[in-house]
């Protein structure tokens, strides 16, 4: 299996620290609002990666944090007239509700920054003791230039970074920082009513970057197999995590850095951002969009690629899901009949070849498009066999099992996919389908067509097969 490592800018063979196990940390949301589709894209991308590791037999220790204190949290709590902990709890629950709807597996652990304050203080003190950090009027800053490898992950020169940073340092920080490029590890309390914790440097709260260094190494060890997040986190967040963690431990922090692509919106493929006021929340989308369609749409694009959120692309995803559903329904319908099966060597070979193509694609840095193409190209032959006079039932049964496993990698539950929406008119539909079957048996084509039209007006789609007529709702 090969992964594209942002640190080296190339694909590398995946070699876990412990054979058969994967330690994986993914930056979670700052919980001051409902998650938008950019947040969902990252969560779904890394959930798909996690699921494929599990499909391959790995045990995955997956840690994803909640940032439950920072400037955004404080500002939003003030605007809503609530406390930071109350705001965090509300949106953590909203996050869990949205991710459950999208069938995102819950993390092995969801640590919260505010629950890790003692560990954060200890981590910062170690950096001070080693000369990598310094206290200034209640704040603590990281001495960036002391870390020789700074800028490696984002492929940037530290002198250029320093020049850019000097233009963004406010007057208040100017007198405290040794260098404009230094960043905050601990922020001293600015107002008496501002959320804060006691520390050796006075009351205050942790900086954003230190939170992830502490939580990842506390729960996964000094060196991680994989660290994931959006491309927007590559700098400065992940760059700063490396500087903090490696300065403290003296060890390589992460072996494989993975970053997912951005989400664009609409026909113009405009980058989604709060500043452009084009953010769409999952909470709002799911009022009108089937969660399985949204999940499949987001999972069907390779994680490093940009993805465009639009009604047309959602509709295309729904159509592909419909093809998978029809194939599974056809197989199940055929397996339930009493006819004797007939082995088909070509179909058995196709199942084996499709499995190999699917895994080869996913082993190549999780190339989901090629994996889906392999499945999609197998459907016509499978459907044809399911509708044949004598089907290869064993191969059909195996393909259905494989397809369920493949779709599970994409976060789809086959049982939910195949579940028919119960309606008050189901019995009526069954009766009309039976009447039409009788009319066809009697070669009463006019009556058969009349019943088909009646069912169509009721939103029912019919499919005639040698084994009988199947129906589904549009």
Curated annotation (Swiss-Prot):
GO cellular component, one term: cytosol
Residues that, per the record, bind ATP: 274
Cofactor binding note: Binds 1 zinc ion per subunit.
CDD domains: CysRS_core (cd00672)
Localization in the cell: Cytoplasm
Top-level lineage group: Bacteria
Cofactor(s) the protein needs: Zn(2+)
GO biological process: cysteinyl-tRNA aminoacylation
Residues holding Zn(2+): 27, 212, 237, 241
Family of the protein in this entry: Belongs to the class-I aminoacyl-tRNA synthetase family.
Name under which the protein is recorded: Cysteine--tRNA ligase
Taxonomic source organism: Lactobacillus delbrueckii subsp. bulgaricus (strain ATCC 11842 / DSM 20081 / BCRC 10696 / JCM 1002 / NBRC 13953 / NCIMB 11778 / NCTC 12712 / WDCM 00102 / Lb 14)
């Amino acid at each position: 299996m090969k992964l594209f490592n942002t640190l080296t800018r190339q694909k590398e063979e995946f070699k876990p620290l412990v054979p058969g196990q994967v330690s994986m940390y993914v930056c979670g949301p700052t919980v001051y609002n409902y998650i938008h589709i950019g947040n969902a894209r990252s969560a779904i991308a890394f959930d798909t990666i996690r699921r494929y590791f599990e499909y391959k037999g790995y045990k995955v220790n997956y840690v994803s944090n909640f940032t439950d204190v920072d400037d955004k949290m404080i500002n939003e709590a003030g605007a809503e007239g609530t406390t930071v902990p109350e705001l965090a709890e509300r949106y953590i629950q909203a996050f869990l509700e949205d991710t459950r709807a999208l069938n995102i597996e819950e993390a092995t652990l969801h640590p919260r920054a505010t629950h890790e304050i003692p560990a954060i203080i200890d981590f910062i003190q170690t950096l001070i003791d080693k000369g990598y950090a310094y206290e200034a009027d209640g704040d603590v800053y990281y001495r960036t230039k002391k870390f020789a490898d700074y800028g490696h992950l984002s492929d940037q020169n530290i002198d250029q970074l320093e020049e850019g940073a000097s233009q963004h340092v406010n007057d208040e920080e100017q007198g405290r920082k040794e260098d404009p490029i230094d960043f905050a590890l601990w922020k001293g309390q600015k107002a008496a009513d501002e959320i804060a914790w006691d520390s050796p440097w006075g009351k205050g709260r942790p900086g954003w970057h230190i939170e992830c260094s502490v939580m990842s190494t506390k729960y996964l060890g000094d060196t991680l197999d994989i660290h994931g997040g959006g491309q927007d986190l590559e700098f400065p967040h992940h760059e700063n995590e490396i500087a903090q963690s490696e300065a403290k431990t003296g060890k390589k922090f992460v072996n494989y850095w993975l970053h997912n692509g951005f989400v664009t919106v609409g026909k113009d493929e405009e980058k989604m951002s709060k500043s452009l006021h084009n953010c769409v929340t999952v909470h709002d989308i799911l009022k009108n969009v089937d969660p399985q369609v949204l999940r499949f749409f987001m999972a069907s694009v390779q994680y490093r690629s940009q993805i465009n959120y639009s009604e047309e692309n959602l509709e295309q995803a729904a159509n592909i899901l419909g093809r998978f559903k029809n194939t599974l329904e056809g197989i199940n319908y055929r397996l339930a009949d009493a006819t004797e099966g007939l082995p088909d060597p070509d179909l058995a070979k196709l199942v084996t070849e499709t499995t190999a193509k699917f895994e080869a694609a996913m082993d190549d840095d999780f190339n989901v498009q090629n994996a889906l193409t392999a499945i999609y190209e197998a459907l016509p032959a499978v459907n044809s066999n399911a509708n044949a006079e004598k089907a290869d039932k064993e191969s059909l049964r195996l393909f259905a099992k494989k397809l369920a496993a493949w779709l599970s990698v994409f976060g789809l539950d086959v049982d939910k996919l195949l579940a028919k929406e119960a309606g008050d008119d189901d019995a009526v539909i069954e009766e009309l389908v039976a009447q039409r079957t009788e009319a066809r048996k009697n070669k009463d084509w006019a009556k058969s067509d009349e019943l088909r039209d009646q069912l169509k007006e009721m939103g029912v789609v019919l499919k005639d097969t040698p084994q009988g007529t199947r129906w589904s709702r549009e």
